[in-house]
């Protein structure tokens, strides 16, 4: 019986890595041998090696929409990355590549195309990111999360699959989460998720009104690397963490209300878990505007309350928390009516088909 092999790739932020992990249990169940290609120093290396998945590093350059002196040197890094990836693919001879986006994926997808290895990519956001845009001519299928995304995909390569959500995230234990946080008072729990890199503006707005928030809530604050505030370390009812992985399902189960960036993976997880949420998308000035589009789509569907980053201040945030609580049932009912499910099985079917399984 043939042993099938898949190489997964994706990196730069946790959002380009964790959806890969959602597919791993099912792939293993089907008998796939799994390897991973990422960058030398990206967050993906730490996340993937923890899962005991063999990891290859390649050179990768960032691709930018704006002028930067590195725009002259980074294409050479991408070229070296294609050569690195090509050597790995020649050695491993995978049946299929699964790419989750991020700049490290571009050399892998190009090398795979040159070697006639089928490539399945996934785009979480409403509009394709720059890496997926560049890589899409070399892909066989581009899976998307939002129905609106299909119009951006050329050559009929688009497939509406939804986003893959880790099964363990849907099976968190509330009491285990409470024990982990060691909250003394039995209040509601407010969780703040600033993304794997953190958000200075969200962190500051929350911390300014902490005393007010703590009257009603215990607070779990995922503030990003290097953003812990030592002066708040011993504050009752407030727990701050740079990044949480293993305990995240339990903390999500514990949360009654979530304030979050609007990365597609996170918002679809909040929808699947039916969590009341306030989205503060990364502004179009600081990004390509993908989070703004994601948040607008969720606001329109009645799943989320949205605050523009440009308008964010502590007073507005406090008012929004109170307004969300007042309208709790309206938002929860909209989420319950959603027909958007976990994309794992849809994506696995496409991977199997591409690998001729």
UniProtKB/Swiss-Prot annotation:
Pathway: Cell wall biogenesis; peptidoglycan biosynthesis. Pfam families: Glyco_tran_28_C, Glyco_transf_28. It catalyses: di-trans,octa-cis-undecaprenyl diphospho-N-acetyl-alpha-D-muramoyl-L-alanyl-D-glutamyl-meso-2,6-diaminopimeloyl-D-alanyl-D-alanine + UDP-N-acetyl-alpha-D-glucosamine = di-trans,octa-cis-undecaprenyl diphospho-[N-acetyl-alpha-D-glucosaminyl-(1->4)]-N-acetyl-alpha-D-muramoyl-L-alanyl-D-glutamyl-meso-2,6-diaminopimeloyl-D-alanyl-D-alanine + UDP + H(+). GO terms for molecular function: UDP-N-acetyl-D-glucosamine:N-acetylmuramoyl-L-alanyl-D-glutamyl-meso-2,6-diaminopimelyl-D-alanyl-D-alanine-diphosphoundecaprenol 4-beta-N-acetylglucosaminlytransferase activity; undecaprenyldiphospho-muramoylpentapeptide beta-N-acetylglucosaminyltransferase activity. It is a peripheral membrane protein. One of its GO terms (cellular component) is plasma membrane. Its EC number is 2.4.1.227. It is found in: Cell membrane. Gene3D superfamilies: Glycogen Phosphorylase B. SUPFAM superfamilies: UDP-Glycosyltransferase/glycogen phosphorylase (SSF53756). One of its GO terms (biological process) is regulation of cell shape. Keywords: Cell cycle, Cell division, Cell membrane, Cell shape, Cell wall biogenesis/degradation, Glycosyltransferase, Membrane, Peptidoglycan synthesis, Transferase. UDP-N-acetyl-alpha-D-glucosamine binds at residues 13-15, 166, 196, 291. PANTHER family: UDP-N-ACETYLGLUCOSAMINE--N-ACETYLMURAMYL-(PENTAPEPTIDE) PYROPHOSPHORYL-UNDECAPRENOL N-ACETYLGLUCOSAMINE TRANSFERASE, UDP-N-ACETYLGLUCOSAMINE--N-ACETYLMURAMYL-(PENTAPEPTIDE) PYROPHOSPHORYL-UNDECAPRENOL N-ACETYLGLUCOSAMINE TRANSFERASE 1. Cell wall formation. Catalyzes the transfer of a GlcNAc subunit on undecaprenyl-pyrophosphoryl-MurNAc-pentapeptide (lipid intermediate I) to form undecaprenyl-pyrophosphoryl-MurNAc-(pentapeptide)GlcNAc (lipid intermediate II). Belongs to the glycosyltransferase 28 family. MurG subfamily. HAMAP family: MurG. This is UDP-N-acetylglucosamine--N-acetylmuramyl-(pentapeptide) pyrophosphoryl-undecaprenol N-acetylglucosamine transferase. It comes from Clostridium perfringens (strain 13 / Type A).
């Amino acid at each position: 019986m043939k042993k099938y092999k898949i190489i997964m790739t994706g990196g730069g932020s946790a959002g380009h890595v964790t959806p890969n992990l959602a597919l791993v249990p099912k792939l293993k169940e089907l008998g796939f041998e799994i390897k991973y290609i990422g960058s030398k120093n990206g967050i993906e290396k730490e996340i993937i090696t923890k899962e005991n998945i063999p990891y290859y590093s390649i050179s990768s350059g960032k691709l930018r929409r704006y002028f930067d002196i590195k725009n002259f040197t980074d294409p050479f890094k991408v070229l070296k990355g294609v050569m690195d990836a090509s050597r790995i693919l020649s050695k491993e001879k995978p049946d299929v590549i699964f790419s989750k986006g991020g700049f490290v994926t571009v050399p892998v997808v190009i090398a795979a195309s040159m070697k006639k290895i089928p490539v399945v990519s996934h785009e979480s956001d409403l509009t394709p990111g720059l890496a997926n845009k560049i890589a899409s001519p070399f892909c066989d299928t581009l899976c998307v999360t939002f129905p609106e995304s299909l119009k951006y995909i050329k050559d009929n390569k688009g497939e509406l699959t939804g986003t893959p959500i880790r099964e363990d995230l849907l099976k968190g234990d509330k009491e285990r989460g409470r024990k982990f946080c060691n909250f003394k008072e039995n209040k509601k729990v407010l969780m703040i998720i600033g993304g794997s890199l953190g958000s200075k503006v969200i962190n500051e707005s929350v911390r300014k009104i902490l005393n007010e928030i703590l009257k009603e809530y215990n607070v779990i604050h995922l503030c990003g690397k290097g953003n812990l505030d030592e002066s708040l370390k011993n504050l009752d009812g407030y727990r701050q963490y740079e990044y949480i992985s293993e305990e995240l399902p339990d903390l999500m189960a514990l949360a009654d209300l979530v304030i979050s960036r609007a990365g597609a993976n996170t918002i679809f997880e909040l929808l699947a878990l039916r969590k009341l949420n306030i989205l503060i998308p990364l502004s179009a000035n600081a990004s390509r505007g993908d989070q703004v589009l994601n948040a607008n789509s969720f606001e329109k569907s009645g799943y989320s309350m949205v605050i523009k980053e440009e308008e964010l201040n502590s007073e507005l945030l406090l008012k929004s928390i109170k307004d969300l609580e007042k309208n709790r049932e309206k938002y929860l009912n909209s989420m319950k009516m959603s027909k958007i499910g976990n994309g794992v099985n849809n994506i696995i079917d496409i991977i199997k088909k591409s690998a001729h399984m």
